[in-house]
Regions:
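Short, surface-exposed ligand- or partner-binding patches at beta-edge/loop junctions that are enriched
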Residues: 100
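Rhodanese-like catalytic fold shared by cysteine-dependent sulfurtransferases
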Residues: 2-8, 13-57, 64-96, 105-142
């Protein structure tokens, strides 16, 4: 019986260790994400709001289909058509580009693509427009 109890406790601890969840970033500092070919920077909706007050970057919505936009968006480039739309992005691969989508999934894919293409100053808004709206911030529609 003791052996069975020991195995049950061990199994429970193992499950608990493997079931960890990724908590949302709460740091006040953007976080670097390493990917093949370099890295990009994750930024929260709160951090992006402050960045937009002194905008010094190209702001790109990569979500498809169109579901709205954040004010001051410079371009719309579908996340899966980045390579075919480089003309909509800065020619300078060191220029700061901030990406967003609806939830963060598409923009993360786009960020990895830009890094693979040699862009060195790529930023991705975690949580996308959903995180933006959660803060009570508005979206625009065409």
């Amino acid at each position: 019986m003791t052996r069975l109890l020991f195995v049950a406790i061990l199994f429970t601890l193992l499950l608990a260790a493997c079931a960890g969840s990724r908590a949302p970033a709460t740091s006040s500092q953007p976080a670097k994400v390493s990917v093949p070919g370099g890295s990009y920077t994750n930024v929260s909706a709160t951090q992006l709001k402050a960045m937009l007050d002194k905008k010094d970057f190209t702001f790109v919505n990569v979500h498809i289909p169109y579901e709205g936009e954040i004010a001051k968006t410079d371009a719309f480039v579908p996340y899966n058509e980045i390579e075919n739309n480089l003309g909509k992005l800065p020619a300078d691969k060191n220029a700061k580009i901030v990406l967003y989508c609806r939830s963060g999934r598409m923009s993360a894919i786009a960020a990895k693509t830009l890094v693979r293409l040699g862009y060195t100053n790529v930023w991705d808004m975690e949580g996308g427009m959903i995180a933006w709206e959660t803060l009570g911030l508005p979206l625009k529609t065409k």
